Amino acid sequence: MIVRKPPMGWNSWNTFAADINEKLIFETADRMVADGYLDAGYEYLVIDDCWSLRERGEDGRIVPDPEKFPHGMKAVADYVHSKGLKFGMYSCCGSLTCAGFPASYEHEFLDAATFAEWGVDFLKYDNCYKPQEENDPKLYRRMGMALANCGRDILFSACNWGADESHKWIKETGAHMWRSTGDIMDNWASVKSLIEQQKNIWQYNGQGCFNDMDMLIVGMYGKGNVGLGGCSTEEYRTHFSFWSLYGSPLMMGCDIRAVNDECREILLNREVIAVDQDEAYRQPFFLNAMHNDGTVVMCRLLEGGDVAVGFFNLTDSPRRISLTLGDIGINTSSGKALAMRDLWKHEEIGTLTGIYRTPELAPHASMLIRGRIVDR
């Protein structure tokens, strides 16, 4: 199975944690279609931890909790598929999941076969309760082999939180996406920390094995399982801009049944999503090496010759950020310029021929442009 674009979808953990059931999943599937998320590219609906009973069945298989999922997981998968969506589930490389439910250690091939029988299309694979003598590369390779031999295409989302320098070995496991960070929390400090953690590993991002900066918190506003304080709408926009420019998977974590209009517009911004989903999937690169002044300028070369540039003010004070043609790599003697479009305002903002300075960016604000190289 080859995955050419960063996966997009919804995951239950950020908002609901253990408070999941069949009704929630069915309603979320309905809204993913009715509210335009599927059309925008969000195709995976993923149930995270806490979906099973505390003990395996007599046949050794994991048993879905009959109170939460009275019709079983095959019925849930069938409903999700009937909406044109793909269905995802969760397990762990240890003996227990992070919440203490049965996990897949030494049951990898059985669990992969079970997931395939249920119609699972996506597996998030966490990193809790593994034996001390075991190492992450072997355990993730083992599940990678099990999924590759289960008879069904199942996207493998490896979630070991960036431990053991996983960026150096994760591709060998067969993972299609890999968590490079610890868990995100719904506050600005967490978003900023996850951004800063990318400065030394950006070059390991690549098509088919995508650097996952964790699920989106856009629209949570402090509510739910990881809702520790919440963010402002502007901070959510910065969060979404960086994840998209970086090419991270976009997995929504809010309750999409209750998200407000502003955050729905963020999540459904087709121009920003197009940057994340660019078919060339070239690595982004930092133009200012994360300056000590707290600003970040990051660029990504896109299919067809365009470039995307993000300006990020991570400080607590207003900032204006500069960009020159030379920063991008266009020499002044080339006779070329850069026609720029603001992807949040959806408007052309002029042509860069020398130096561009952003409008004043409020604390934690950002600007994302798409540039087209033109003759002067």
Locate predicted features.
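Catalytic cores of secreted or luminal carbohydrate-active enzymes
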Residues: 238-288
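Structural recognition of the beta-strand scaffold that forms the well-ordered cores
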Residues: 7-12, 41-47, 86-91, 121-126, ...
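Glycan-recognition surfaces
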Residues: 107, 138, 149, 155-255, ...
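Carbohydrate-binding surface patches
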Residues: 243-246, 251-253, 290-332
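Solvent-exposed beta-strand/loop surfaces of large extracellular or lumenal domains
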Residues: 336-356
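C-terminal beta-strand-rich structural cap/linker in extracellular carbohydrate-active enzymes
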Residues: 352-376
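Aromatic-lined carbohydrate-binding/catalytic grooves of carbohydrate-active enzymes
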Residues: 28-132
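N-terminal module-boundary/linker segments of secreted carbohydrate-active enzymes
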Residues: 1-23, 31
